[in-house]
Amino acid sequence: MDDAPITPLAVPSEARTLIVFGGTFDPPHWGHVKPVVEARVLSGLHDAWLVYVPAARSPHKSSGPVFPDARRVELLRLALAEIDHAAIWTDELERGGGAATYTIDTLRRLRRLRPGAALRLLIGADQALALHRWREPREIVALAPPLIMLRGGVETTREKLTAALGATGAWSASE
């Protein structure tokens, strides 16, 4: 378990649901904002807080971000300025030191920080289909049941996506 100090999260302690959305945000753009806000609405979690988690370096990419961490955070802050119930949690940047960070570790740390909150992980369909290659995918699903958003370039229907997810072994039919 990661014993590094946990970065505070600028979300009210009474927030009951946190939708976690991670990425390199290199640089952040409207495609990192609009679909996430829409996913909150479509999921019916209107009062949930959107927690953006900039990655130090994605374990799924061969190189680190082009933009420096501080610049990515500042640009993300500007992109989210008009979005209600949205926060940036820099825990991965502060503990990563430029190394790859893993979603499971981030979710465990967030659970320690907010033990009473319901956690949901927002991921694109492309990432959902690759979840079986992530570190400890079954625990990820247990800690933060995913919300899956369709993205450009991923041609699928709900039925095809459900079947493909089940075939990966990271998901069960009930999830």
Language-model features: locations:
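Nucleotidyltransferase catalytic core that binds NTPs
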Residues: 1-175
